[in-house]
Every structure is written in structure tokens, then in C-alpha cells.
């Protein structure tokens, strides 16, 4: 499967401000993967980030409990995690 060069996202650009953006897909190495996100949890820290209470660098795409399908994966990552392209996974935030 050929992957697109960009991905659409709603990006937090400041307190209470989102902007639609096409972002370049990152290159992956042997130890990383690219996830086609289907859903993502929004928790208290995301709300604080949106409100401007949690001071984090912007721009940023909120959400850090993603669920999706592996679109591309490096060989070492595939062996270490026991997953492959096409597998549906939920990502632990400590691993992201």
C-alpha cells in the first residue's frame, strides 16, 4: 500500500484555538512505526492543554491514547512488539 505524503489533523495552535492542517508524515526507522489513527482518547490533560492551563509547546495535536492500524513499521519494532502492518493496536501512552 502506498502511503500519502501528508496527514490531515486539527492542530491546537493556542488556547481554545484549532486550525486544520496537512502535516507531513514522518519517516520511520527500524525501531519505530507509523499508526493510522482511527480513534483517540481525550483526557483531563488534553482539556487543560486546550484551555491553556497546561503550558505545552504549540502547535500540537491533542490526544495521547490512540487506537489504529499499523501503516508502516520497522523490522526491529515489529519483532520487539510482535505486530505487523495491518494489525489494529491500542498504544499505551508510556510507549508513545
Please place each PLM-identified region on the residue numbering.
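Short structural boundary motif marking the start of a folded domain
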Residues: 3-10
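Short glycine/threonine/proline-enriched tight-turn/helix- or strand-capping micro-motif at secondary-structure
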Residues: 16-24
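Glycine-rich beta-strand-centered segment in the early N-terminal region that forms part
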Residues: 24-40, 50-96
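Short cysteine clusters
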Residues: 43
Amino acid at each position: 500500500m502506498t502511503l500519502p505524503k501528508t496527514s490531515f489533523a486539527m492542530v491546537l495552535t493556542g488556547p481554545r484555538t484549532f486550525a486544520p492542517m496537512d502535516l507531513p508524515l514522518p519517516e520511520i526507522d527500524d525501531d519505530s512505526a507509523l499508526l493510522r489513527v482511527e480513534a483517540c482518547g481525550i483526557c483531563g490533560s488534553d482539556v487543560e492543554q486546550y484551555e491553556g492551563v497546561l503550558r505545552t509547546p504549540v502547535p500540537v495535536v491533542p490526544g495521547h491514547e490512540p487506537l489504529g492500524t499499523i501503516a508502516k513499521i520497522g523490522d526491529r519494532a515489529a519483532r520487539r512488539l510482535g505486530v505487523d502492518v495491518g494489525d489494529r493496536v491500542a498504544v499505551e501512552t508510556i510507549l508513545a
